[in-house]
Design a protein with these regions (language model features):
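Conserved catalytic core of the tyrosine transesterase superfamily
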Residues: 1-300
Length: 300
């Protein structure tokens, strides 16, 4: 009964949230996972269900989650999910008080994202064998990802009508369906021209899809497939850093800041709604400068 009741509340909340806000499927999947994991934790560690929680139960949960090295961004997402979920329970009269009101996340040191230096990025972009159909496709995807600092979801969701390889710009749809126009680097533009002319028609064969990047079977490329592609090439060239699907996006922003780009311009290119999100790349830049100073200064 407990499990069914809690899972029904989760499903009802997600249905309501989707209908009222219209968020992406990725966000809904993440929220569902966050709430199910929390539900399992409650079942294993307490005698509480969602309707009888106190603030201390949530504090204990977050303290335990922090101890398993959860990233700040993941913590923030879970907190956002919990705030919306418990407000929904309050609005629907399932609970009388919101246990998460005025709750603050446990403090944790800021963790800078892993980034690749310019030579490592060059090596990664040159790893695909462009004499092959698949290699040229992979090269085009990697070039575009780094050229524009795209999120992987933005990359794989690009449609044919969003790319004009002769206009030197692409249109992408980011979080909240916000569109932004992004300039293409010369190398990305040249590779995309070859991909459109020589590769995509072969991958499409007799199929029909307006997805720009296609899998080996002529279907739209998936996040999982592209993540596998990145890891495979990184392993092939000996990059041993812990990578993520956002690694080239981080490299894009870090290298722009290192070369003197205005932070607000970087914010617009990345599609960040708040410049405080972009400021992490100034910290990375300063960390690199400090490391170089300590390494090369005679009294460092």
């Amino acid at each position: 009964m407990w499990l069914m009741d809690n899972r029904k509340l989760i499903n009802d909340f997600l249905d309501n949230y989707w209908l009222s806000v219209g968020v992406s499927q990725n966000t809904l999947n993440a929220y569902r996972s966050d709430l199910i994991i929390f539900d399992n934790y409650l079942k294993q560690n307490t005698d509480k269900d969602f309707k009888s929680l106190s603030k201390i139960n949530i504090e204990n949960y977050f303290n335990k989650r922090v101890n398993i090295d959860m990233s700040m961004s993941t913590q923030a997402r879970i907190m956002s999910c919990f705030r919306k979920f418990f407000q929904y329970l309050l609005d629907e009269n399932y609970i009388k008080e919101n246990p998460i009101v005025n709750f603050k996340l446990p403090k944790k040191d800021k963790k800078l994202p892993v980034h690749l230096n310019e030579q490592e990025v060059t090596n990664l972009l040159e790893a695909p064998d462009i004499s092959t159909t698949i290699g040229l496709r992979d090269k085009a995807m990697l070039e575009l990802l780094y050229s524009c600092g795209l999120r992987v979801t933005e990359l794989i969701n690009i449609k044919l009508n969003q790319v004009n390889v002769y206009n030197e710009f692409i249109m992408v749809s980011g979080k909240g369906n916000k569109e932004r126009m992004l300039p293409l680097s010369n190398s990305a533009m040249e590779t995309l021209q070859k991909y459109e002319k020589e590769v995509r028609p072969n991958l499409l064969n007799q199929g029909k899809t307006n997805a720009y990047f296609l899998s080996n079977r002529g279907k739209a490329m998936s996040r999982q497939n592209f993540w596998y592609i990145i890891k495979r090439y990184a392993n092939n060239i000996g990059i041993n850093k812990p990578l993520s699907p956002h690694t080239l996006r981080h490299a894009f922003a870090t290298h722009l800041v290192q070369r003197g780009a205005d932070l607000r311009a970087v914010q617009l290119l990345l599609g960040h709604s708040d410049i405080s999100t972009t400021q992490i790349y100034t910290y990375i830049h300063n960390t690199i400068l400090k490391s170089q100073h300590e390494k090369h200064h005679p009294r460092g």
